[in-house]
Curated annotation (Swiss-Prot):
Biased composition regions of type Basic residues, renumbered to the chain: 23-34, 101-116
Annotated LRR repeat ranges: 224-247, 248-270, 271-294, 296-319
Protein name: CCR4-Not complex 3'-5'-exoribonuclease subunit Ccr4
KW Translocase (keyword) present: no
Chief place where the protein resides: cytoplasm
The reaction(s) this protein catalyses: Exonucleolytic cleavage of poly(A) to 5'-AMP
Cofactor: Mg(2+)
Compositionally skewed regions (Polar residues) per UniProt: 36-78, 165-179, 196-208
The species this protein was found in: Coccidioides immitis (strain RS)
Classification via InterPro entries: CCR4/nocturin_mRNA_transcr, Endo/exonu/phosph_ase_sf, Endo/exonuclease/phosphatase, Leu-rich_rpt, Leu-rich_rpt_typical-subtyp, LRR_dom_sf
Family: Belongs to the CCR4/nocturin family.
C-alpha cells in the first residue's frame, strides 16, 4: 500500500547491496563492497522531510527522476537506467526492503572494477570513465561514496552531472576501442548489407528528388566513384603509400588500430573526406594540412599520444565530432571540448590561429619585351587594367565563410587590405565589383583620389526606392581611372532585368519576368580618351548573377549586355573630338621651386576617329560567375551562340532564344594567351575561374599579366578571405598596347608610261 506505516520509510543504501558478511563466497571483492554504515541497522527510520514525494507517484513534469535525491538510482554520472554496481542488468525489478536477499544471486554477480576496463558486451552502458565527473585513477566506489552515486552524507552536494559533450566522447571512444579487429567497419557494412541485391528494375534513389548524401556529383557511369570508403583498420600499418592520397573522391577513411607514428602532409589532398578515423595509433602530432579537409564531419583521434592540436583544425568549420579521449592533451584544449564540445574548440583554434607568413608576391609575367618597364609608366600607348570582386561586407558572414577568423572577415581590416593592394598595383583602370554605396562614397573614392583616380559608380537595381540608410548597404560596380591619363567622355549603366522587359519581343515571355527581371545585376560602361595619344577606349565593368541553377539567366544577361554595348559603341563613334585635353596642373611646384629637369609638357594628339563600332578598343571586365567552356564564355569568345544551346533549357526569352545571340567584337580573354589561371575564386566549396578581362584582339595586344598565387602557400590554406587575401576572389591585372590602325596601301601612279610598257 502506498499509504501504509512505512510510506516514506526507505532503506539505507546498504540494504540494496550485499553487505560484507553476506559475501563470504567472494572474499576477493570485500574492498569493493564496504559500505558507509547508516545510523539505523534496519534502515527503517522515518524521514523528517514531510515534502518528500511518494515513491509510488511519478515525479513532477518539471523534474527529472535522475535529479531526485531520494530515488534509488540518482547517480549523476550515469545516464543509463537501472544500473547496479556499475553493471547493466536484464532484469528490472525494484528491490523490496522488507525481504532479505538470499545469500547467492547469480544474476547480480560482482565483477572487478578497473579504471580502463573495456566493455565488449554493452557499449551503450559503458560505465568506466576516464575523465569528467569520475577520476580514471580511482575506484568507482570509494568509502566516501555509496554505489548509487550519492555521498554518505545527504547534506553534501551531489556531484555535477556529466554533460552531453563528454558523454558522447566516452561512448565513441568505447566503440572505437571495440573496433580493433581487421577491417572492422568494412565487415560491419558487409554484414548489414548481406543478402541485399540491387536489381535492374529498382528505382534510383535520386529519382524522387532526394539527393544522395556525401556522394560525388559525377556522371552515373563513373564506376570508380561507386565506392567512396576505405577501411585499413587493424592492419598494423606503420606507413602509408602516397598512392592512397590520389583517391581524392574518398568520403570515409579508416586508419584505426595501426602503428602509425605520423600522418603524411599529403592527407590534405583528400578534400572530400567527411569521416576520418585515426584512433589507436602512435601519433604524437597532426600535420597542419589537416585543415584542408574542410568537409570533415567526424575526426576521431582516440588513444594516441597527442599533447596538442594544430591551429589549422580551426578551418574545419563543418566538423561535428572531434574524438580526443585517450590523449594527454593540454588542459586548455581538453577542458574546452569537455565543457562546451567540438564546435567550441574548433572556434577557439580558429580565432587564436597565428598569422602565417605571407605568400611570395605574384609574378608579373612579361609577354612582350618592349613592355618590360611599362608597368611603371613608360610607353604612353600602353595601359594597365585591373578587375577585382572585393566581397561586399554584407556578404562576408561567419555562416558563409566559417573557416575565416573573425578578424580577417572584419570590413575595417579587409578594406584597408583592398586599398593597399589596389594602390600597390597602380593600374590605369580599376574595375571593382561588390562595392556598396557607403564604402564607395565614404572610403574608396576619397582614398583613391590621392592616387590620381576618378571614379564612376552605380549600385544594383534594388537600391532604387530604398531609404537612404538601407540603400547604402546595396553593392554595385565602381570603375576608376587615372585622371591625368584619361578623359571621361560618357558613362552608362545597364540593368539587365529592366532592359529585358523593355524589349519589344518580351511580351508573352514568362521566363523574362519570372527568372530574369527579378535579378538586379548591372554593368557599368565608361567611354574614355587618352589625353596624349587621342586613343579612345570602352570599358565595361559587369557582375553577372551567381546561382549555377540559373545558367540561362547568366547567358541572357551577357547577351543583353553585349547587345547594349554594341548600340552604345555605335553612338560613341559619333562623339566629336575633344578640344581641351590638357590635364590640371599646379602653377608652381609645392616647394615653390622649379624642379630640375622639368621638360615641356607634351602636346596632346588629336582625338582618333573610328569608322565603326568594332574599331573602338574595348575591355569587358568583371565577375561573370561562369567557367571556361560555359555558354557565357563561348558567347564572348566566339561572338555567337546558337538558339538551341542546352544552357537555355528550352526557356523563352524572345528573339534571343528564337534567333540566337551575337555581337560584332572580336573578344579574347587576356589570360587565354598563356592559359587561364588555376582559379580566380578560392573557397572550400568552389575553386575555379569565373573572373575575366576580355579585350578586342583586333585593336589591343596583351603585353603582360599578373601571375598565379604561391602554390606552397595554398597547401595549408583551404580558402579565402584570410589575413593576406581580403576577398574570396583574386585580382586580375593585364597590360595592353593599342595596335596601330592599318591604313590602306597606297598604289603608285606612274601615269601614261605604265600603259605603254604593257
Amino acid at each position: 500500500m502506498a499509504d501504509g506505516t512505512y510510506r516514506f520509510q526507505q532503506p539505507g543504501a546498504g540494504q540494496f547491496y550485499f553487505q560484507t558478511q553476506q559475501h563470504n563466497h567472494h572474499p576477493a571483492h570485500q574492498r569493493h563492497l564496504i559500505r558507509n554504515g547508516t545510523s539505523s541497522p534496519t534502515g527503517r527510520l522515518k524521514f523528517n522531510n514531510t515534502d518528500t514525494p511518494s515513491p509510488s507517484r511519478s515525479p513532477p513534469l518539471n523534474q527529472s527522476p535522475s535529479h531526485n535525491s531520494y530515488t534509488m538510482y540518482s547517480q549523476g554520472h550515469q545516464g543509463q537506467p537501472v544500473m547496479m554496481n556499475g553493471q547493466s542488468h536484464q532484469r528490472f525489478g525494484m528491490p523490496m526492503p522488507k525481504f532479505q536477499h538470499p545469500t547467492h544471486h547469480p544474476h547480480h554477480a560482482q565483477q572487478p572494477h578497473h579504471p580502463h576496463s573495456q566493455s565488449t558486451q554493452n557499449l551503450a552502458h559503458q560505465h568506466n570513465f576516464s575523465g569528467g565527473a569520475l577520476s580514471n585513477a580511482a575506484q568507482h566506489f570509494t568509502p566516501a561514496h555509496l554505489q548509487n552515486g550519492t555521498t554518505s552524507n545527504v547534506e553534501d552536494e551531489i556531484e555535477e552531472p556529466m554533460n552531453e559533450h563528454w558523454q558522447q566522447q566516452l561512448q565513441l571512444a568505447a566503440e572505437s576501442r571495440q573496433a580493433s579487429s581487421p577491417h572492422y567497419y568494412a565487415r560491419a557494412v558487409a554484414q548489414q548489407t548481406k543478402g541485399l541485391q540491387l536489381s535492374s528494375n529498382q528505382a534510383d534513389p535520386n529519382e524522387n528528388g532526394t539527393e544522395e548524401r556525401n556522394r560525388a556529383t559525377a556522371v552515373k557511369d563513373h564506376r570508380r566513384q561507386d565506392w567512396v570508403a576505405l577501411d585499413f583498420g587493424g592492419q598494423g600499418l606503420r606507413a602509408l603509400s602516397n598512392g592512397l592520397f590520389h583517391y581524392s573522391f574518398l568520403d570515409k577513411l579508416y586508419l584505426n588500430h595501426n602503428k602509425l607514428k605520423s600522418l603524411p602532409s599529403s592527407i590534405g589532398e583528400l578534400k572530400n573526406l567527411t569521416h576520418l578515423d585515426i584512433s589507436s595509433n602512435e601519433l604524437t602530432e597532426i600535420p597542419e594540412e589537416i585543415g584542408m579537409l574542410t568537409n570533415l564531419k567526424k575526426l576521431l583521434l582516440f588513444d594516441n599520444s597527442l599533447q596538442t592540436l594544430p591551429f589549422e583544425l580551426g578551418y574545419l568549420y563543418q566538423l561535428d565530432t572531434l574524438g580526443i579521449e585517450g590523449n594527454p592533451l593540454a588542459d586548455v584544449l581538453k577542458s574546452r571540448i569537455m565543457q562546451e564540445g567540438t564546435k567550441s574548440l574548433i572556434k577557439y583554434l580558429k580565432e587564436e590561429m597565428p598569422v602565417h607568413l605571407p605568400p611570395s608576391n605574384r609574378d608579373w609575367l612579361i609577354l612582350d619585351e618592349t613592355g618590360k618597364n611599362s608597368a611603371n609608366g613608360g610607353n604612353d600607348n600602353k595601359f594597365t587594367a585591373l578587375t577585382y570582386n572585393t566581397l561586399c561586407d554584407r556578404y562576408a558572414t561567419n555562416q558563409q565563410y566559417g573557416y575565416a577568423p573573425s578578424r580577417a572577415l572584419a570590413w575595417e581590416f579587409r578594406r584597408d587590405l583592398l586599398l593597399n593592394e589596389i594602390r600597390g598595383h597602380d593600374a590605369d583602370i580599376v574595375c571593382l565589383q561588390e562595392i556598396d554605396q557607403g564604402s564607395y562614397h565614404g572610403f574608396f573614392r576619397e582614398q583613391l583620389a590621392y592616387n590620381d583616380y576618378k571614379g564612376v559608380y552605380w549600385p544594383k537595381g534594388r537600391a532604387q526606392g530604398m531609404p537612404e540608410e538601407e540603400a547604402k548597404l546595396v553593392d554595385g560596380c565602381a570603375t576608376f581611372f587615372k585622371g591625368s591619363k584619361y578623359i571621361l567622355l560618357e558613362k552608362n549603366m545597364i540593368h539587365f532585368g529592366q532592359t529585358a522587359v523593355r524589349r519589344p519581343d518580351a511580351k508573352g515571355q514568362d521566363d523574362i519576368y519570372n527568372r530574369l527581371w527579378q535579378k538586379d545585376n548591372i554593368a557599368v560602361i565608361v567611354f574614355l580618351e587618352n589625353r596624349l595619344t587621342g586613343e579612345r577606349l570602352i570599358v565595361v565593368n559587369a557582375h553577372i548573377y551567381w546561382d549555377p541553377a540559373y545558367k540561362d539567366v547568366k547567358l541572357i544577361q551577357v547577351a543583353i549586355m553585349m547587345e547594349e554595348v554594341t548600340q552604345l559603341a555605335e553612338k560613341y563613334v559619333k562623339i566629336p573630338p575633344c578640344t581641351d585635353k590638357t590635364a590640371f596642373r599646379f602653377s608652381e611646384p609645392e616647394d615653390g621651386k622649379e624642379s630640375q629637369g622639368t621638360s615641356t609638357p607634351v602636346e596632346p594628339a588629336p582625338s582618333v576617329e573610328y569608322s565603326s563600332a568594332s574599331q573602338i578598343p574595348i575591355l569587358v571586365c568583371g565577375d561573370f560567375n561562369s567557367c571556361p567552356g560555359s555558354a557565357v564564355y563561348n558567347l564572348l569568345a566566339h561572338g555567337r551562340m546558337a538558339e538551341e544551346h542546352p544552357d537555355l533549357e528550352q526557356r523563352l526569352y524572345g528573339n534571343l532564344s528564337r534567333m540566337g545571340m551575337s555581337h560584332p567584337f572580336t573578344l579574347k580573354s587576356a589570360y587565354s594567351t598563356i592559359g587561364e589561371l588555376s582559379f580566380t575564386n578560392y573557397t572550400p566549396g568552389f575553386t575555379d575561374v569565373i573572373d575575366y578581362i576580355w579585350y578586342s584582339s583586333n585593336t589591343l595586344q596583351v603585353t603582360a599579366l599578373l601571375g598565379e598565387v604561391d602554390k606552397e602557400y595554398l597547401k595549408r590554406v583551404p580558402g579565402f578571405p584570410n589575413y593576406h587575401f581580403p576577398s574570396d576572389h583574386l585580382a586580375l591585372m593585364a597590360e595592353f598596347s593599342v595596335k596601330s590602325k592599318k591604313n590602306k596601301p597606297v598604289e603608285a601612279d606612274f601615269g601614261p608610261q605604265r600603259e605603254k610598257t604593257m
